[in-house]
């Protein structure tokens, strides 16, 4: 007999072991971003959000991608189950709205809330671009303002943005104070990520010139969808280590049938009650996921002065 996550969190509350940030620590607002699709962005976003919730943090996952893969993994059929009013869309287009509270919904993971997306959110790309062309550049701060309106309730906000450099992605960059970039070790993905970084630098310079400074507490790269049986991937992994240095998460997120099988069930590996392949494959997959997510967790905690002494005691500072 085991305990539910809600019961574990109750016990953490009784024993004073909740890992929450202090009230004067900044909320970690983390974007999992790459301008190329198919790199494992949504998979990493959802598994990271659930991992943090399992650890006892208060987490908000914001699905900013109109493809709504993250929302789908929480059991929604986005264009049937969700209206445009359930997403970011009203907040991005209606200046009179001052809070994102209306769009937040609890999930079956205790401590993890979701702002979902559906295809209708894509319409806001055109509307934001048109308004910005008329000189309303401050619209890029709308998402930042919305997150600020609810951030007091959370330790971490994880954002899953669209895989494109549009108005929503720029808004995510403005809102985020940390960035995680998933990079599969293939020639196409590696080269497109290099282009993404160059474009990111150029975009941030333009924003700075317009008085919109964007500061990141950390930038990490995750080798995603890794198949080390392929010699070219092994070579590219070595190259990534040389180029990204300590910014590269040490644990690669290897390709696994457990992730694929969980996704086919509209679930994550953390939700599966048992292996869908074999026990050893499941354990290896969880080792990769926990390894990636635990490194990012340390980066998040390093943002919080209240965790300094604990990180030193744990040998993580």
Go through the PLM ranges and name each one.
Residues 2-317:
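P-loop NTP-binding core
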């Amino acid at each position: 007999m085991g305990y539910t996550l809600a019961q574990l969190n109750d016990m953490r509350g009784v024993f004073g072991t909740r890992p929450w940030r202090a009230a004067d620590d900044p909320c970690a607002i983390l974007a999992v971003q790459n301008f190329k699709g198919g790199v494992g962005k949504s998979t990493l976003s959802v598994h990271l959000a659930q991992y943090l919730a399992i650890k006892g943090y208060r987490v908000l996952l914001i699905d900013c991608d109109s493809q709504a893969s993250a929302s789908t993994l929480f059991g929604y059929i986005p264009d049937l189950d969700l209206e445009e009013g359930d997403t970011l869309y009203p907040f991005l287009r209606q200046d009179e709205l001052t809070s994102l509270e209306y769009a937040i919904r609890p999930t079956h993971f205790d401590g993890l809330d979701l702002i979902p997306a559906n295809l209708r959110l894509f319409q806001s790309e055109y509307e934001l671009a048109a308004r910005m062309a008329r000189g309303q550049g401050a619209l890029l701060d709308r998402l930042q303002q919305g997150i600020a309106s609810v951030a007091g309730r959370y330790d971490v906000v994880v954002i899953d943005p669209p895989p494109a450099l549009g108005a929503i992605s720029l808004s995510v960059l403005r809102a985020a104070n940390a960035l995680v970039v998933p990079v599969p070790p293939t020639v196409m993905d590696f080269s497109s990520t290099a282009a993404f970084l160059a474009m990111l630098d150029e975009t941030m310079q333009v924003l700075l010139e317009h008085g919109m400074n964007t500061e990141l507490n950390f930038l990490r790269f995750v080798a995603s969808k890794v198949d080390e049986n392929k010699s070219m991937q092994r070579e590219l992994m070595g190259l990534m280590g040389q180029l990204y240095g300590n910014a590269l998460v040490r644990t690669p997120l290897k390709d696994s049938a457990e992730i694929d099988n969980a996704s086919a069930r509209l679930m994550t590996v953390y939700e599966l009650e048992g292996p869908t392949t074999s026990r050893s494959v499941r354990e290896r997959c969880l080792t990769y996921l926990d390894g990636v997510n635990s490194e990012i967790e340390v980066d998040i905690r390093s943002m919080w002065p209240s965790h300094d002494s604990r990180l030193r005691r744990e040998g993580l500072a």
